[in-house]
Design a protein with these regions (language model features):
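Short loop/turn segments at strand-loop or loop-helix junctions that form parts
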Residues: 2-10, 43-44, 108
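Histidine-anchored nucleotide/phosphate-binding helix
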Residues: 3, 16-33
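Short, solvent-exposed loop/turn segments at secondary-structure junctions
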Residues: 10-12, 49-50
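Leloir-type glycosyltransferase catalytic cores
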Residues: 14, 115-139
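Short secondary-structure boundary/capping segments
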Residues: 17-21, 55-58, 101-103, 118-123
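Catalytic donor nucleotide-activated moiety binding site of glycosyltransferases and closely related
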Residues: 27-70
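Short acidic-hydrophobic, aromatic-tinged amphipathic segments that line or gate anion-handling sites
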Residues: 66-72, 124-127
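A donor-sugar binding/catalytic signature common to diverse glycosyltransferases
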Residues: 72-117
């Protein structure tokens, strides 16, 4: 399980009305949907560098199945080994689609609402379905 952290001042998070409660809700659903799986919370590179704060801290690692990861592994390598990807609005969700995942999305990023994601809050204005190739081409 891969849960993606984002920085607190990320424009995509702010546009999705993301806050501490939404990130906590996302982690809760990841635990509920996959109760026996290990959850890796991938910190943002700028959080790791000490430049911008993220939403998740060690306090969110409430069991031995949840851990923060701020290492150098490629996001592609992390996704390859993940059974699911959770994000609010990170572009990692788009990359997850390209990698063959159907990410769980809790915000309103450009890639949500086209039938390629599990949307916690469906995007009502998007009424048609796209393939991953169509979404990639549009972007």
């Amino acid at each position: 399980m891969l849960v993606i952290d984002q920085t607190r001042d990320d424009a995509a998070v702010l546009a999705s009305k993301g806050d501490d409660a939404l990130f906590s809700e996302m982690l809760y659903y990841a635990q509920e949907n996959h109760p026996n799986q290990r959850i890796i919370i991938k910190t943002h590179p700028e959080t790791r560098a000490g430049k911008r704060a993220g939403y998740f801290t060690a306090a969110h690692c409430t069991t031995d199945k949840i851990s923060l990861y701020s290492g150098d592994a490629s996001i592609w390598d992390l996704m390859e080994n993940a059974i699911a990807v959770y994000t609010v609005s990170s572009t990692v969700g788009f990359e997850a689609i390209i990698a063959g995942h159907r990410p769980h999305v809790f915000g309103n990023p450009f890639y949500a609402g086209w039938g390629l994601t599990h949307d916690a809050f469906p995007v009502q204005r998007r009424q048609r379905r796209l393939t991953a190739a169509q979404l990639f081409w549009v972007q």
